[in-house]
C-alpha cells in the first residue's frame, strides 16, 4: 500500500507551511525559491488551494534588488542571493498560469521577471554564456549554489567549475527562465516580448552547445572544465538544448556511474524524473 508514503508526504508538507513555506520546520525555517516551487506544486495537487502560493510569489517579488536579482530566501533579515534560484520564481509563475490562468495576478509580476532576465543578459560574456555571476557561499557576493550533492560538498553545493569561471547550469537555468517567461508573456498577449525571449534563448542554446560540451557532445559543468554532473544533462533535456536521443545517452551514462558524475539530490530529483 502507498498509504504510508502518502501520509508522511502530506504531513511533511503541512509541517513546512506556516505563514510562509519553509525549507524545514525546525532548523532554518526559511522560504527558499527552489524548495517552495516543489512544495507549491504538491499543494496544487492535494488541495487546489493557491493562497499560500500567491503569497510566496508576492514575497519573492518584494525581495527584488537594484540589479534585478531576488533573494533566494525571503522573508530574510538581509541579502541572500543565489542567481539561479530567481529562475524558480519564474517557474512558479508559469506553474500558476498552467493551473489557474489568472492573468491579473501574473501581470503584477512581469516587471520582476524582466528584471531577472535582464540581470542575466547583462552578465553574458563574449561567448554568449552567463558569466561568473557568483561563487562560494560567504566568500563571494552571490552564491552559485546548484544542489547539495556529495561531489560538491567542498564547494558548498557549487560545481567545481565555478572556482575557475562560469558554470553551465546557470546558462541552462537562464535559458529555462527565458522559455517559461516567453510562454507567460504570450499568454498575456505580449507577443513581441515573448518573441524576444525566445530569440535570446536560442542564442544561448548555440553558445552552450559550442562551449559547454565535450568532443562527444556531453555537457560539461563549465566551459573547458572536464567535470560532469547529472544536473547539466537533465537541464539540457528540459530546455531542449540537446536532442532527446543524445540526451538519453548522456543521462543514462550518469545514472550508471555515480562516482564520475555528480548526482541529483532528492530535491533535484524532481527535475531528474
Question: Residue ranges of each PLM-predicted region?
Answer:
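Active-site core of glycosidic bond-cleaving carbohydrate-active enzymes
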Residues: 31-47, 51-273
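An acidic-aromatic substrate-binding cleft motif
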Residues: 1-36, 43-50
